[in-house]
């Protein structure tokens, strides 16, 4: 090849002939969908252990045998696998919420994070706060809110505050004079402290109060300086020694700027924040014990904004969720009303309260802005916390900020955000599945199929075992569910479906924790009738089991299906041995957490079941309960009618498919083909050494990569495998011979 250099020099080139390799395949990922108590709806969630299952999807419930779904998931996890779980939807499923102007809206359903972002995160929604996911679990949770509404509560001895000029939005001033400490110096100051009234509480007996937000300090020469409230500091707060003067933009009780004809001495002056509680029914918790007073964040202050901070706490007031009254589930401090706010400590963490709760709260989403309008039902009225200007005439310096431009969700620049003070919202109206007659957990077949459909795309969701769990109400629905799950595996061709029996075919009374009321002959006939019409597939397994196990959450024994255990056994076999070993038998097929079986078939009954693709679970004295069959659901004789062969091919195919992807867009020549053979051959030799193959052959040369194949931009490799077979049938022949007979005369003849 001619050098690309045009003048003397050294060109360094690299050629990589190591592209691609056959990586190990860890196939221990199960998948199940069902009507769980809590958790995101129609969203695939990774679960690694039972504690994760409890945290994300709640505990098992007695209603509608929902525990069968939950305990099937738990059973699979007990074998060492990981699980992908989808919570199925339902038309009756609704999210608990605090409505806008009402207790709650009855139509709200926020399925998951994406559903909130796409459909429920703008300000036009009809809820203020909503549970993170649907269901009754969040009913009566309290969302406690507080912002920088006021600095002080001042007592005013009058029965008519408006006549005195003390109305929301009006200014309040008090004359001050004295030595003002500065930075390394002092100065004599004469002027007044200026604030804005944010709340009034009129008392008929004259013990009225006003809530005041400190705004600025104004000198006698008219120079105005923004200040922050400092309790007990006469230059930064109001006291009981100097008269209060109420002033609005047109001059209440007209007089010089910042004064009026007659002053009113405050009867009392207390810190507003110190008086605020979370507003709970069963306990009294002061906000000051949880966090410092909200004020202005560094981000907003740097942009000449004010009063953006707020705190939010989520409290289990009645103990319905945690069993502890007044239990604080979450506490979110120093959130912001500014839509562009960023944490000064954990940048670039966004602190806008809706974004923050969306990403970091475990229990709630935020909806409509409570600062957008007054809410008579919840008793909130947004109040201005400052004036439009801080110099000049009353018309500007005592005109409250415009409400529409200072709501939550606006950018920080030059904003003086409105406030509503301390408010507690009760979220309610959450409903469970098919709630007629009480909280239910009956999953609709159509919704279950939609949920399982989320596992269909193998490029998006990794799955090795799709677990059916329990069947549906009728046998026909159970068969429809089973066939759909099998179709997923047939379409993906990289996983297996674990199909179980219809409950009423084995246990006569659904939901009854007692023993089976059916004879074994009836159970056998029922199983043959149920499994007979199901789709023939080597990507599925059928089993006969329902096991009797203890439900520690409801303190009782229950029957649950064993198809999740079959998936778990295959995962355990891959972890402890290799995927191409059979998961059945006393070594690898032992059933976890089983007291007894609903159906323990005899040899004669197994002889009827096994030819019909049904693997039995049996209990054997001295050996325990284990899987006694390793057939796939294939309806005809083939090497793929055994689980270990199908699992061998799944493992090899996945490993070599990844290796083949590295050959895409390479040149189809001897070098590429040799490189691919050098990847495949050592891998298959290793599988053979580990007892997965009897023999193999790899053809990837000019015999199958003909000129026509090459011209069609194709690459072909033919891989022939002789899979190892599991032992299903054992014959022991004992022959008695006469003393004088030589064994060579009779060996092989009987």
Model-identified regions with their sequence ranges:
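Extended assembly-interface regions of large multimeric machines
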Residues: 1-318
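Short, charged, solvent-exposed linker or helix-capping segments at domain edges/interfaces
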Residues: 139-142, 323-326, 730-733
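Short, cationic low-complexity segments
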Residues: 150-155, 175, 335-345, 738-750
